[in-house]
Every structure is written in C-alpha cells, then in structure tokens.
Amino acid sequence: MRVALYPGTFDPITLGHVDIIRRAAALVDKLVIGVAINRDKGPLFTLEERVAMIEAECAALSAETGTEIVAHPFENLLIDCARDVGAQIIVRGLRAVADFEYEFQMVGMNRALDDSVETVFLMADARRQAIASKLVKEIARLGGDVSKFVPPRVNDALKERLGRA
C-alpha cells in the first residue's frame, strides 16, 4: 500500500491545499494530512477546528478519488510523523522559488534522518500560486473577500471567527 503524508499547519485550509490533496490522492492508496501543532505560529483556529475543516473537505475528495484520506495531528519531527503513519512519501506543494529553497533544505535534513522516505513536490496550479493561509487571514482580517481562496465552509468560519458573519 502506497501511503503519503501531506504536512502543514492548514490555518486555514485553502483551495491551494485542496488542489494538492486532490492531486496527491490520485498517486497513492492512502493520504494522511499531517496537521502540524506549531505553537510558534499562533494559529487563528484551534487544532480541533483545523482538523474538522480538513475532514469536511476531504470527505468528498476521498469519495471522488477512491483514496483513503485522513487527518492526523502531529507535534514531533516530520520524518517521525511519516514513520508513525507508515508513509513512504512526503508530499509538498510548491508555489514559487522561495518555497523551493526552504523545501530543498528540508529534504536534505529529512533524508539525513531517514533516507527511506521520499519527498515528492507538486507544483501549485497557476490559478492557486498566490494563495497562502497567512495572506488569506490578513485579507479576511481587513474585511476583504477571501471566497476565491478558501472552501465555502472555511470562508464562513473565517467570517465567524473575525466577527464578520
């Protein structure tokens, strides 16, 4: 069974993330969405809320692709999380050259820790390259419309959280 891990903070999940999930799911038998617990980032949504948003989006994707897709919170090293969930592959999305430089370093470190886990990069769809959770939150905080960047449920959650419902 081919198992892949797609890690991120997903605060919140965006249409860019959903696109990568859809495409990654087509490549494996099981896709684990690793929801990082990163206290340094000070997330807008709790871990439970982020997991619930991911699960809501992935239910339809799982049915569409025939791939098992599950959310899995983690707080340890990425490579340890990959081992914990039985993943042979780590999936990363790339939007721009700046993403590549960071990811290149991460691949090197992960390989040094465990060279049996492969990293696969999926380029962001051209329509989604500018989307970043950080920017989505900033636009939403300032009263902008983020409905083009996030799933409808997430848009509603942002409005509610930021008092714009």
UniProtKB/Swiss-Prot annotation:
GO terms for biological process: coenzyme A biosynthetic process. Substrate binds at T9, K41, L78, R92. Its cofactor is Mg(2+). It catalyses: (R)-4'-phosphopantetheine + ATP + H(+) = 3'-dephospho-CoA + diphosphate. GO terms for molecular function: ATP binding; pantetheine-phosphate adenylyltransferase activity. The record marks H17 as: Transition state stabilizer. It is found in: Cytoplasm. ATP binds at T9, F10, H17, G93, L94, R95, E103, R128, Q129, A130, I131, A132, S133, K134. Homohexamer. This is Phosphopantetheine adenylyltransferase. It comes from Ruegeria pomeroyi (strain ATCC 700808 / DSM 15171 / DSS-3) (Silicibacter pomeroyi).
